């Protein structure tokens, strides 16, 4: 089967999709005009063993380049993980142990090949070249930058101004990451917007070492399901790529409508023309839950399989008797009004999921009240900031948020 060929304009359109910044687009065009596979690099420190959808924004961009016929280098920073990336941190980040790095790194390849073509991806570890680097070589590398240049970085400058300690090894991180681009002779490096300084460091160092400078492309940090903070396990606003199909389905259908376009742009592989048509349908009155369902099924098929995608709604919390999540799930916001928490009886009454307190207590006693698919007792409560899906009886349901 002959692989599709892309015009320069088609390549640029796909590369620009979801990209925050391209430094510089003029250089990128020059490289694309060479009509040879470009060496595309993205580095990942194995700081956590499991990926969520926020991590896949960058991997999806690698997939775009892969589909265009370019060479993909998925760099696992096992060496740099021993330093600890200070990007965006207001304090020194503790380095990982060799055992932690090995355990975390082992899970990466398996997960990324849910997206990337294994046969067309080179997985490399930066310990391959750094383990053989001498102290003299490292000092030589450090000589290519100044302390004043390092302090131009936002997080370093803030810590310096507030007299928060900055360890010398943290200054090495951008240099070491930059040297990765030299070792791989990268044409393009991808990273999150929090990595701009480090990506540009690689571009600068390539020039100092006599190489053609890489193009730097940043992608946005994806908001989590709360629509405010970045997707993070610690904030419990994430969708894990290993989440069960029903869990993934329910989480994605719970996202705010304001995130639909961004999630499609960054997470879906549907052509943007098709995405724009879906957005237009929603503006014309199509239920947003139906649009979310389309995205949920695409992602579940990618990370599980087509059968799981077709049946995910049946295990998504059993909100209705047949397992189908309603597309018009009512949303209710409740106020604490000076209380530390709201108990389930109060919640059922205030959310109009029960006729009265007696009815609420009776349903709870009969095990007819479920929160996110789990039966709860009278001791269940919600505190500020929590959002859940509640089913009371066979047909009463609501998405409840406590302020």
From Swiss-Prot:
A motif ('KMSKS' region) lies at residues 230-234. Signal peptide: none annotated. ATP binds at residue 233. One of its GO terms (cellular component) is cytosol. Residues 342-402 form the S4 RNA-binding domain. It comes from the Bacteria. The keyword 4Fe-4S does not apply. Keywords: Aminoacyl-tRNA synthetase, ATP-binding, Cytoplasm, Ligase, Nucleotide-binding, Protein biosynthesis, RNA-binding. It catalyses: tRNA(Tyr) + L-tyrosine + ATP = L-tyrosyl-tRNA(Tyr) + AMP + diphosphate + H(+). GO terms for molecular function: ATP binding; RNA binding; tyrosine-tRNA ligase activity. One of its GO terms (biological process) is tyrosyl-tRNA aminoacylation. A motif ('HIGH' region) lies at residues 46-55. It is found in: Cytoplasm. Pfam families: S4 (PF01479), tRNA-synt_1b (PF00579). Its EC number is 6.1.1.1. CDD domains: S4, TyrRS_core. Catalyzes the attachment of tyrosine to tRNA(Tyr) in a two-step reaction: tyrosine is first activated by ATP to form Tyr-AMP and then transferred to the acceptor end of tRNA(Tyr). Belongs to the class-I aminoacyl-tRNA synthetase family. TyrS type 2 subfamily. Homodimer. This is Tyrosine--tRNA ligase. It comes from Psychrobacter arcticus (strain DSM 17307 / VKM B-2377 / 273-4).
